[in-house]
């Protein structure tokens, strides 16, 4: 299957491709294992969350993971965390929303595709009106992938937090619309908040380097099995759950 160039003006072909795209699971497992050895995250769970997550994954129900965003290393440290968690069994069936610029360089695109990337054309990069149709299509594709049994990882803050790494930035309604649309396809997802801390940052405007991202603390919250009915309410719940996860990651660093 030909992989189209990831450009906004080509978004229909891009999302047709990523609706059907499937990672090579063995390559994905190898890639995640390498990242796990490189970044060595310290993974923790709130009381009962690990067993609940294991049971949720065994059930086959789709899951949306909401993750805070601190640096450009985050997709790789999150992949390393998946290796050291019950998510290892889902490697190859987890989709990750990633900004479109990560798909420009061919070598980087291969890595992002290996990790299950789905491109996002952001309003801050292209203009809100320009990305509206592509954004609607992206949310539909995510809902369809969830309905097909995939899991979905989202950085719902939308950009790296260069303000205060201990406080979750505003969360847009996109994650709520994805969950809402998946429910309309008879695949209501569960929500799991996953937060990272790279330790104290004297200057939050300077994001952690890849070296500083080694041995980050990650904390999983317990799954939320019943989500609100409206996208905006789902987004508010996401922010609340993610802040609790961030508090835990900072406290346990």
Task: Name each model-derived stretch.
Residues 17, 57-130:
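Catalytic core of membrane glycerolipid acyltransferases/transacylases, capturing the structured
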Residues 223, 228-253:
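A cross-taxonomic marker for long C-terminal extensions/tails that follow the last structured domain
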Residues 19-42, 105-115, 209-211:
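Alpha-helical membrane-targeting segments
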Residues 60-62, 92, 148-150, 187-188:
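Short coil/turn segments at beta-strand junctions that form active-site/ligand-binding loops
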Residues 109-110, 151, 158-233:
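A cross-family acyltransferase "interaction/gating" segment
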């Amino acid at each position: 299957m030909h992989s189209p160039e990831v450009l906004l003006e080509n978004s229909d072909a891009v999302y047709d491709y990523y609706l059907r795209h499937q990672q090579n699971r063995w390559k994905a497992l190898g890639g995640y294992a390498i990242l796990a050895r490189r970044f060595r995250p310290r993974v923790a769970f709130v009381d009962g969350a690990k067993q609940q997550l294991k049971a949720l994954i065994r059930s086959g129900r789709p899951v949306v993971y909401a993750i805070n965003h601190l640096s450009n290393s985050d997709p790789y440290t999150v992949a390393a965390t998946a290796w050291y968690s019950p998510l290892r069994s889902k490697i190859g069936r987890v989709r990750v929303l990633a900004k479109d610029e990560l798909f420009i360089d061919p070598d980087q695109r291969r890595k992002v595709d290996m990790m299950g990337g789905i491109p996002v054309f952001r309003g801050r990069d292209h203009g809100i009106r320009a990305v509206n149709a592509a954004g609607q299509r992206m949310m539909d594709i995510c809902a369809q992938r969830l309905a097909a049994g995939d899991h979905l990882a989202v950085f719902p803050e939308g950009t790296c937090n260069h303000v205060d790494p201990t406080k979750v930035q505003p969360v847009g309604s996109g994650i709520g619309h994805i969950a809402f649309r998946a429910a309309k396809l008879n695949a209501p997802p569960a929500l799991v908040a996953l937060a990272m801390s790279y330790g104290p940052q004297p200057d939050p405007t300077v994001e952690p380097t890849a070296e500083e991202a080694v041995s980050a603390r990650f904390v999983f919250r317990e799954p939320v099995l019943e989500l609100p009915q409206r996208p905006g309410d789902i987004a508010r719940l996401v922010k609340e759950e993610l802040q609790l996860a961030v508090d835990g990651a900072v406290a346990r660093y």
